Amino acid sequence: ASQVTILREVERLGGLTICHSVSDIRNAFEKGKIAAIFHIEGAEAIDPDLHMLEVLHSAGLRSIGPVWSRPTIFGEGVPFSFPSTPDIGSGLTELGIALVKRCNELNIMIDLSHLNEAGFWDVARHSNAPLVATHSNAHSITLHSRNLTDKQLRAIADSDGMVGLNFAAAFLREDGKMLADVPLSQMLKHLDYLLEILGEDLSLIHI
């Protein structure tokens, strides 16, 4: 609640526009404003009956990550280990599938970053929305489970979804180390790879 209050105060002061739809985002861009979207990463706050999803949606929630690299009642995340593959653990639970379907009905975007591969494919199977991973890189370059395989990237492209480049060093460096001295060329290597598969309209910079 405190974060929502802060964001609304920043909006009141003219620093950004809180957006609830694509048209809101377009209008914000036209006015030269930052377009802000309410997002939660890891759905631990959501109860099995999805009542809190309704409450948060009423408060402005428009994007959700079902997991944050650890299990929830909805699915399983990927470990922070290197080298590693996203192909670990089981897929979405029945509650996870229900969450996906209700998010579709409420026009809440589902963020696939942090979700394991089985969960990714379950979302692809049960969601009628474009696939989105807001902060993930190319697994073919950096063998970290937080990154996306070529097959996953192609599925996102086929759905007209999008991928945001992640600036975290361990997901960029080919040795998987969390060191700050990542050259710009390494970021561009991942970005070029995403552009090759997704095209420029579906590749983003995540900050």
Which residues does each predicted region cover?
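Outer-membrane beta-barrel pore domains
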Residues: 178-184
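Extended, charged catalytic domains and RNA/DNA-binding interfaces, predominantly
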Residues: 1-176, 187-202
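Conserved small/polar residues in nucleotide/adenosyl-binding loops
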Residues: 206-207
